[in-house]
Amino acid sequence: MMLKWIYKFYLWDVYIMKIKQQKQIKGYLVREFGEEKGTELFSNEEKILNVLIKNTHNKTENQMNTLITTILPRIALYKTLLKADLSNEDVHNYMQNYMINEVAEKKHSSTAKMELVPFFYKIYSSVFLRVVRKSDLWVSEQNYGKDYFDVTMKKCLWHTACVENDCEELCSLFCDVDDITYGGLKKIGFKRTKTLGYGGDCCDFHFYKK
């Protein structure tokens, strides 16, 4: 049993090196802090990420994959900056800069390009609802009509991960990524009045056809 767990942890170590977002985080840290300091911070981030992964239990394969490739690297970055010689305000600013400029803007650009596809709204709404309905990343309710679709998320893996890793305050930045990603699109409108990350009892996504 012990050998099995050691091998599993070894595979995680190898997996971390191949996570695409890790390359993005390293590049960001080097640009912001310079080669020497940025590389040192990234090394610390990798160690923290490894610990976060090893301490994550009772998750499905799909949830674990999403945590490793998407959520935990950002939590590890946040915890790395908290341990650096930075003020809380600076830590927030660095994380906000990363989440908005490195993550959200690229997601928005990718979504905007998809709008060029004929019947984009019909396709996107159908896929979005199907994914949310079948995925174990959220606990949600869906409602839809001809020109709109709503998703009320009562639980989401992003918020859960932040709570479980003692950084619930970080979750609001994950929510901000959604606002940038879906804001200002030409064929789909997006509104939301509350989120789990900002202290609400749910995330009330409302999409509508423009």
What is each model feature region?
Residues M2-L81:
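N-terminal, charged low-complexity regulatory/assembly segments
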